[in-house]
């Protein structure tokens, strides 16, 4: 059976991973909604019956085929060659940085020290410069162990002029696709959903043709907040699960959890207009096992998510969660292959891929344009 072979492949991945422990950490989870269970069962049945072979999914036999060790605290090993960061530069990079400073706008690109900042801001291969704008201030109410954004229980109140400033700035840059994200604002009655909605609506009013991806927090699972943002006019509703189900409490803030994030993605699919894509992202190299990754992918796909991205966890400072291992480009490629077999419409997977990834945005834009052309 295909699914049996599929599981064998995941088992082989586990054997290839050098830093996997003999007993993985598990957590007790709440039973998933019946709809999710039905979707998961249907996905597994389809994988068991389909004919395309997955024998090439993972055949990583050498010691370094799946990952490379990071060394010890006293004797760290150098990063592998594929993790070398490019230096930011170029005329467009300078222009965007200057404009952001003038308008006092924040980008997650800088706050989170994204390794792709140079490529995205300078235009990269597609020639279109992009920046992921962070609204609701630069201070988060949560403290996830992987994130470099500063935190506070009582951050400054949101700037009431920010939605207008952000919309006008982005509209003037001549972009076709933009990502708007935010810090968590548990201190606000509506978790910041109203501010998010206003920003999207103002930008769409100024430039209706622009495609907008909203990378949102979980709003503590509040359905009204999710519905409000889902119906704001966005084209892609994104919310990141960040890591496998078993490592949620070790990686994310205690107010976040796997089920809550899946529920948010499912609600967005229900509330958003037809044709709106849902998207999520996961980091590798946090101590997860390949089998846990596969199971997480199954549940995400069963929740109706259209797009999934995989990237390497990179420690922003010594006070943050350490990297457990560097996953090889070959292993990332295999996860992409499996994701497409599962039925995701698009999967971006690579060491330097982040949830707001320029190449992925370019592909998603093409996909949305194609969908709309076909339906017109």
From Swiss-Prot:
Keywords, sorted A to Z: 4Fe-4S, Iron, Iron-sulfur, Metal-binding, Mitochondrion, S-adenosyl-L-methionine, Transferase
Catalytic activity: [[Fe-S] cluster scaffold protein carrying a second [4Fe-4S](2+) cluster] + N(6)-octanoyl-L-lysyl-[protein] + 2 oxidized [2Fe-2S]-[ferredoxin] + 2 S-adenosyl-L-methionine + 4 H(+) = [[Fe-S] cluster scaffold protein] + N(6)-[(R)-dihydrolipoyl]-L-lysyl-[protein] + 4 Fe(3+) + 2 hydrogen sulfide + 2 5'-deoxyadenosine + 2 L-methionine + 2 reduced [2Fe-2S]-[ferredoxin]
EC number: 2.8.1.8
Pathway: Protein modification; protein lipoylation via endogenous pathway; protein N(6)-(lipoyl)lysine from octanoyl-[acyl-carrier-protein]: step 2/2
Enzyme's top EC category: transferase
Name of one Pfam family that matches: Radical_SAM
Protein name, as recorded: Lipoyl synthase 2, mitochondrial
Species per Swiss-Prot/TrEMBL record: Pisum sativum (Garden pea)
